[in-house]
Amino acid sequence: DWLKTVYSETSSSKLNKHYKNWANLYDIDMSSWGYAYPLQLNKILTNKLRLKKTIKILDAGCGTGYVAEVLNKLNYKNITGIDFSEEMLTIARSKKIYKKLMCQSLNEKIELRSKQFELIICTGVLTSGHVGPSALHELVRILKPQGFFICSIAESVYKKNGFEKEIKNLKNLVSIKSISKAFVALPNNKNSAKSRMYILEKLN
């Protein structure tokens, strides 16, 4: 099971290799496992946040662009994607839904200027073996004041891996607008964890 493999991996170079080998089947697997994040994002953007279609969006940890297809269907067109896997980005590029794609790790300083995105989405990324809580500060840095950061965080790592603490540390920069009820991210995969969707708003 690819899911078990990637979430138990501790080496970033091996993780990159796993995604290289998984890239061509990723969308098929996500679809068959009932990937919940696209639906969750659709609900947030349709019911909770009524944002202009022209806003500048960052899809952080975009992978193949599977979740960003929701943005495209909702007529958001100004989307930048970042991912550390060139193979996943090749799939994303073929969908022609991104204005710009960048290959880099979110665990490092992001090569983008501060305060430029009105919306950042980050789903299925802030979890074990992938991107740690230290990335939150960098993502908030490139978010515009009054901009929104929508992310999913697995229940199993929220406290244990320091995400709760890091969000508290950012209290002078962001406020928590809402936290969803816990849901199973991949209902048709026995190795899937429960997650919640967090909406943070940048203060200044």
Task: Show which residues each predicted segment covers.
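Conserved Class I S-adenosyl-L-methionine
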Residues: G162-A182
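A short acidic, Gly/Pro-enriched loop at the edge of an enzyme's catalytic core
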Residues: I110-I120
